[in-house]
Amino acid sequence: MEKLMIEGGTPLEGTVQISGAKNSAVALIPAAILADSTVTIDNLPDISDVRLLGELLKEIGGEVELADQKMVIDPSKMFAMPLPNGRVKKLRASYYLMGAMLGKFKKAVIGLPGGCNLGPRPIDQHIKGFEALGAKVTNEQGAIYLRADELKGARIYLDVVSVGATINIMLAAVLAKGRTIIENAAKEPEIIDVATLLTSMGARIKGAGTNVIRIDGVESLHGCRHSIIPDRIEAGTYMILAAAIGQNVLIDNIIPLHVESLIAKLREMGVDVEVLDDQVRIRNHQEKKGVDIKTLVYPGFPTDLQQPATTLLTQAHGTSIVTDTIYNARFKHIDELRRMGADIKVEGRSAIINGKTKLQGAKVRASDLRAGASLVIAGLTAEGITELSGVEHIDRGYEDLEQKLIGLGAKIWREQMSDQEEEQVKSS
């Protein structure tokens, strides 16, 4: 196992290039199952979740080539191979295989997903959608079994706005008979990205990006070529990092509209944010002041940036309150920040941060992907050296993290853990 070593205190400067969106990639790759011919996806981030999905497509008979941020998928020999165990459980987004395989083969067996440990992430809205389309769904020994004689379009109202359920129902509905209407649909940019791919394959989808999506089923879908949108969460992470310890940082290959809620909060804190066509520049000249943040579904403040933002607010003057309305278990990073000297207490779904505090390097552990990002920011801000374990979580969602940070002047490197350190991590 590896750990990240971070020597903090060096102001960052330069340009960082944003990769393709992880949250799009993990849905676009399963979507290729629905096609009858080759699908090529460009601008893929080089992260472990993408590699894992490529391997899963091979397990069900697909031919997959992955090189230079491009995946070429030939789905013509795929079949409804059950995937109750193994790799499928390592990946939260493996649930998109349910919608895609149900849509293509009218049956699927998928082990319940893993990935980030954020408390219960129920898939009841996904199942409700599949059942409305005519599928029989059972949960047996930690795997979801789906079967349908035929899928028929339906009107589906989501009780909770869910990106995962919106995409999964789209995947299952594009080859169903008749019209499907998803009401109270999520509006995230990644949903538009998936709808764009499916439309290029021949699907008939209207309203993606609004709260009502209409899908008219078609007989078959063909291959296509698609380029993924930039990763708004990676972009936001670097914007927060630049606000915490940057002097003059240019974030390149970004859609500013997708990070509007973050731009507004940074400006409210007193950060100098310059918005260009496909770039954002962060300059840091003055003291930052505390603000209150409440996570909401898009276009509100993203839950995926709540943890990095919490770290930033330790460096702002005054009291800030961060409330996560999406995932109430997303505060595992706070104990680690406290080890570094942060003054934070958790009350229910809120973290109350008293700043400004000087953070000190410490041994800390990332419990999930975005907690890892928040602790990297903390390490770069802190005095001394921070040792960060749980690096595998970061590798799931951030491409070339160290190289991008080194390009900005950060002092960050990897080391192998000792046997004793590995034992400590496994037992904690």
From Swiss-Prot:
GO process terms (BP): cell division; cell wall organization; peptidoglycan biosynthetic process; regulation of cell shape; UDP-N-acetylgalactosamine biosynthetic process
Protein name as annotated: UDP-N-acetylglucosamine 1-carboxyvinyltransferase 2
Reactions that this protein is recorded to catalyse: phosphoenolpyruvate + UDP-N-acetyl-alpha-D-glucosamine = UDP-N-acetyl-3-O-(1-carboxyvinyl)-alpha-D-glucosamine + phosphate
S-S bridge residues: none
Gene3D superfamilies recorded: Enolpyruvate transferase domain
CDD domains hit by this protein: UdpNAET
Family, similarity comment: Belongs to the EPSP synthase family. MurA subfamily.
Biological source species: Halalkalibacterium halodurans (strain ATCC BAA-125 / DSM 18197 / FERM 7344 / JCM 9153 / C-125) (Bacillus halodurans)
Amino acids binding phosphoenolpyruvate: K22, N23
GO cellular component, one term: cytoplasm
EC number(s) recorded for this UniProt protein: 2.5.1.7
InterPro entries for the chain: Enolpyruvate_Tfrase_dom (IPR001986), Enolpyruvate_Tfrase_sf (IPR036968), MurA_subfamily (IPR050068), RNA3'P_cycl/enolpyr_Trfase_a/b (IPR013792), UDP_GlcNAc_COvinyl_MurA (IPR005750)
Compartment list: Cytoplasm
One Pfam family hit: EPSP_synthase
Function: Cell wall formation. Adds enolpyruvyl to UDP-N-acetylglucosamine.
Keyword list, A-Z: Cell cycle, Cell division, Cell shape, Cell wall biogenesis/degradation, Cytoplasm, Peptidoglycan synthesis, Pyruvate, Transferase
Pathway entry: Cell wall biogenesis; peptidoglycan biosynthesis
Residues bound to UDP-N-acetyl-alpha-D-glucosamine: R92, R121, P122, I123, D124, Q125, D304, I326
UniProt modified residues of type 2-(S-cysteinyl)pyruvic acid O-phosphothioketal: C116
